[in-house]
């Protein structure tokens, strides 16, 4: 039995925030942003849009593409760092909106690795006979926690959501290997100080701007360039494959320099690497599922293609999924 992706979906806000607009907001320039990040523009949700809104929109597309009804879902997992509220979970809000009454629902908070964590967890659930179809979503409204007076972080982030319906198939296409990991000692390099039980919201935390993303970019760069290669090697080794076998490499879209460094070390060419951060920025947990969904939509994937997905994020969390693209005709 293989765990297969039965259908993908994505949702992106309409509003585009380009580098020229950011030039008017902070001390930066289009040239500075492009040179250091590779980003030209990003999508920003309007004030009335919540993470769950993008989630259910992406989910509806995935359900339609997989020919799945909401009532068939056994579980919904949402990977997000920007839930609608502390509770109930965003997954429960999505479950209600979709009318997926038979599905259990919970969120996973693994930063930008959220979708990979959620998909890896779904894979394990599907090894049980109780679960047949699971909706996995990676979504974040990073703009809600971005400090638009900090030029080092405000140029990076965008909003979006990607979804996958996963199920069981016979031997053939499907997940070949998965790996989830974390290094909690690096948590201090990427975090949001206030808003939790350690430092609850207060007048003081708001005045001190403690509800925004804090990041040590140099530390994250050093971590990411090593870990992307290490995770990729582990996934391919587990499956008895090599870099030369990869048809599509989908890395987390944090920074173009990180991606190019990984490509060079792994000798994966540009034509086999998905890069969309130039138009969408870092959408956190949404990067990989949005990329995969749009690649399928554009006809860039064919059955049998080997897809390598690797992410890293706050925690510091990291992980990856290696899969053979496609689905059986007799999915049950």
From Swiss-Prot:
Pfam families: ACP_syn_III, ACP_syn_III_C. Keywords: Acyltransferase, Cytoplasm, Fatty acid biosynthesis, Fatty acid metabolism, Lipid biosynthesis, Lipid metabolism, Multifunctional enzyme, Transferase. Its main location: cytoplasm. One of its GO terms (molecular function) is beta-ketoacyl-acyl-carrier-protein synthase III activity. It is found in: Cytoplasm. It comes from the Bacteria. GO terms for biological process: fatty acid biosynthetic process; secondary metabolite biosynthetic process. Its EC number is 2.3.1.180. It catalyses: malonyl-[ACP] + acetyl-CoA + H(+) = 3-oxobutanoyl-[ACP] + CO2 + CoA. The active site is at 112, 252, 282. Residues 253-257 are annotated as: ACP-binding. Pathway: Lipid metabolism; fatty acid biosynthesis. One of its GO terms (cellular component) is cytoplasm. InterPro entries: ACP_syn_III_C (IPR013747), ACP_syn_III_N (IPR013751), FabH (IPR004655), Thiolase-like (IPR016039). NCBIfam families: fabH, PRK09352.1. Catalyzes the condensation reaction of fatty acid synthesis by the addition to an acyl acceptor of two carbons from malonyl-ACP. Catalyzes the first condensation reaction which initiates fatty acid synthesis and may therefore play a role in governing the total rate of fatty acid production. Possesses both acetoacetyl-ACP synthase and acetyl transacylase activities. Its substrate specificity determines the biosynthesis of branched-chain and/or straight-chain of fatty acids. The last Arg residue of the ACP-binding site is essential for the weak association between ACP/AcpP and FabH. Homodimer. Belongs to the thiolase-like superfamily. FabH family. PANTHER family: 3-OXOACYL-[ACYL-CARRIER-PROTEIN] SYNTHASE 3 (PTHR34069), BETA-KETOACYL-[ACYL-CARRIER-PROTEIN] SYNTHASE III (PTHR34069:SF2). This is Beta-ketoacyl-[acyl-carrier-protein] synthase III. It comes from Syntrophomonas wolfei subsp. wolfei (strain DSM 2245B / Goettingen). The gene is fabH.
